[in-house]
């Protein structure tokens, strides 16, 4: 690696030359009271390279706290806002741990579908790092291997008293130095040795010490998940304020909201930072909260950093900056203290912990995320119950949706927002597709108020659907509860349209009372077929309603059906509370784990595993699901 030497006076002139070039947006570390923050530089004298830690990490320039993804005009539809910054950025004074954090963010925003809003800014930037001179008392970057690095930057500065050593990490960095800096000299052997000494000194600066090798963190967490007392004790004082995730350089969760102007005819879709410690983070529109308590959210934060991302990407996503510790009002966010306590508690009960094997990871990418919805028209609207309506929708560009059974779309209503909705129609239905929508949140409530001919936006299809090919030749037992019939209908109708390819077909469907039954005409028509078995049930029947079917919860139907568990696949969808009871009954009938297929519901804001809302332990429902084989998730605590 090339190294150059420049005097501090010439380095200041280099910074001034960058600032004078109005084609560049020059960012640096500046004093802000008794703290430090990244901000635009107006002169080299503002630059502070002797800081301990900045309030926020430099990720804010690539993943801003507030960012417009899409604009809309009711007369024209949706349009993307260009993600490219008006000027290329030069960011001066980035500590090594924040550089490593950016590399982690790169992997996260690249996986599956890359985020163009993040990467356009990353690719148009130059990172000038600086080796740490002062270290925050909360910093433990040396323990995480992030205090001194030889990668990830364009230029890296080391303070050598009256001069800086500059490691050149990229061609962009070298070209920047050649163009704007003067009196740059090759480094001598003593300079190289001194830089090495400075980096070794950094490794001894930390006041925060682990009592064990940090490589044990993933396994420590694995052995501590079920220790509810440990998490309750450590989360007892948590305010659930989210300050720890707000300042974290590797937190990437976000929310998406629409913001209309006063005329309500124009607006924009905004992405804002979000945090898994906030109470409503995992709450869906119906009110179900899949992480309802502070201890479960507190635990999730640590598992996400130290276990889930390790399993998915091969790195512990904590760089040891210490910002979470320094910004926690009740002083409970120190990862070093928590992991030391965890280690000693496990040791006290005789648990042996060995380093986890680093998984072999190959990042799969499939192009860029398209946050811009396609315009579509409501061509038919059929009320089904007091709460559910069936919408038939046609894409305005004339294309088919080309979905798989079990997938979902993100539906946009201008000025209100976007919501994930399961596709109810079979892929064999061409020209249009159907969505059965329950009125529960702001988007679905507004959608119910729209009329035939009104416009909506559609993104998708998304997710992992049912494998209709794998099911060919098998007996199929569909078990649907309530609105769960909607996603199952896409596969059920596909099977009926290709009936000769499948074995026996049984549908068990339950709802609360007769008036809440969905697709009633279709279901009643099944009685005329001799190739489908259908059994309905209701939880209860009011005295003034006629009902000739079963009365009882959905599991009361399972004993009424004879089937061969070796040839039958059970396909299950319904409210969260239903799954464990249905699975227990299926297991009592000797149905193998891999013959049980489930469709799960979670909050989804992006559809491609970036926003973090749908995460259940290490799984992202929006891209790994929503359809799962039970054998793959039976050991995932948050799944069922």
Each predicted region: which residue ranges?
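Ferredoxin-type iron-sulfur electron-transfer modules in oxidoreductases and energy-metabolism complexes
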Residues: 213-236, 254-354, 586-588, 630
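Ferredoxin-reductase
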Residues: 363-454, 511-513, 539-540
């Amino acid at each position: 690696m090339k190294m150059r030497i420049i005097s501090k006076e010439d380095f200041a002139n280099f910074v001034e030359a960058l600032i004078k070039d109005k084609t560049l947006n020059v960012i640096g570390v500046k004093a802000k009271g008794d703290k430090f923050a990244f901000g635009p530089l107006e002169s080299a004298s503002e630059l502070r390279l002797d800081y301990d830690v900045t309030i926020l990490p430099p990720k804010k320039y690539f993943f801003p706290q507030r960012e417009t993804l899409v604009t809309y005009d009711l007369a024209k539809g949706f349009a993307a806002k260009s993600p490219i910054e008006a000027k290329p950025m030069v960011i001066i004074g980035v500590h090594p741990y924040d550089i490593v954090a950016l590399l982690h963010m790169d992997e996260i925003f690249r996986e599956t579908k890359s985020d163009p809003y993040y990467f356009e800014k990353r690719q148009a930037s130059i990172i000038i790092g600086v080796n740490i001179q002062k270290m925050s008392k909360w910093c433990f970057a040396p323990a995480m291997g992030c205090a001194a690095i030889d990668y990830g930057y364009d230029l890296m500065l080391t303070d050598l008293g009256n001069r800086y050593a500059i490691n050149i990490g990229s061609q962009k960095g070298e070209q920047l130095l050649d163009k704007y800096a003067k009196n740059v000299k090759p480094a001598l052997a003593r300079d190289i040795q001194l830089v090495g000494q400075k980096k070794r000194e950094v490794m001894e600066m930390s006041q925060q010490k682990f009592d064990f090798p940090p490589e044990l963190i993933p396994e420590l967490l694995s052995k501590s998940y079920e220790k509810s007392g440990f998490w309750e004790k450590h989360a007892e004082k948590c305010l659930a304020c989210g300050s720890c995730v707000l300042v974290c350089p590797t937190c990437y969760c976000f929310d998406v909201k629409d913001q209309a102007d006063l005329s309500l005819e124009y607006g924009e879709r905004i992405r804002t930072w979000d945090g898994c410690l906030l109470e409503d983070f995992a709450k869906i529109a119906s009110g179900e909260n899949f992480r309802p308590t502070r201890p479960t959210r507190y635990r999730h934060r640590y598992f996400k950093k130290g276990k889930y991302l390790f399993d998915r990407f091969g790195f512990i996503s904590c760089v040891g900056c210490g910002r979470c510790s320094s910004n926690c009002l009740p002083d409970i966010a120190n990862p070093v203290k928590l992991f030391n306590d965890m280690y000693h508690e496990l040791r006290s009960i005789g648990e042996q912990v060995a380093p986890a094997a680093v998984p072999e990871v190959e990042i799969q990418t499939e192009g860029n995320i398209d946050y811009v919805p396609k315009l579509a028209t409501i061509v038919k609207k059929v009320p089904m119950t007091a709460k559910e309506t069936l919408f038939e929708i046609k894409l305005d560009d004339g294309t088919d949706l080309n979905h798989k059974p079990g997938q979902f779309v993100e539906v946009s209503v201008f000025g209100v927002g976007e919501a994930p909705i399961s596709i109810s129609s079979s892929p064999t239905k061409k020209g249009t597709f159907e969505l059965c929508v329950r009125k529960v949140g702001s988007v679905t409530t507004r959608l119910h108020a729209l009329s035939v001919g009104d416009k909506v936006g559609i993104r998708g299809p998304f997710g992992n659907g049912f494998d209709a090919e794998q099911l060919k030749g098998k007996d199929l037992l569909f078990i649907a509860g309530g609105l769960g019939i909607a996603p199952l209908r896409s596969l059920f109708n596909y099977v009926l349209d290709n009936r000769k390819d499948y074995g026996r077909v049984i549908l068990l469907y339950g709802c609360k009372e007769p008036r809440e039954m969905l697709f009633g005409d279709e279901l009643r028509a099944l009685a005329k077929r001799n190739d489908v078995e259908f059994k309905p049930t209701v939880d209860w029947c009011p005295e003034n309603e006629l009902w000739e079917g079963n009365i009882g919860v959905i599991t009361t139907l399972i004993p009424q059906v004879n089937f061969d568990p070796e040839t039958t696949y059970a396909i299950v969808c319904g409210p969260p509370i239903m799954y464990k009871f249905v699975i227990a009954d299926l297991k009592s009938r000797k149905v193998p784990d891999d013959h049980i297929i489930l469709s799960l519901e979670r909050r989804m804001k992006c559809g491609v595993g970036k926003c973090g809302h749908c995460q259940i332990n290490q799984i992202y429902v929006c891209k790994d699901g929503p359809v799962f084989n039970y054998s793959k998730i039976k050991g995932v605590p948050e799944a069922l």
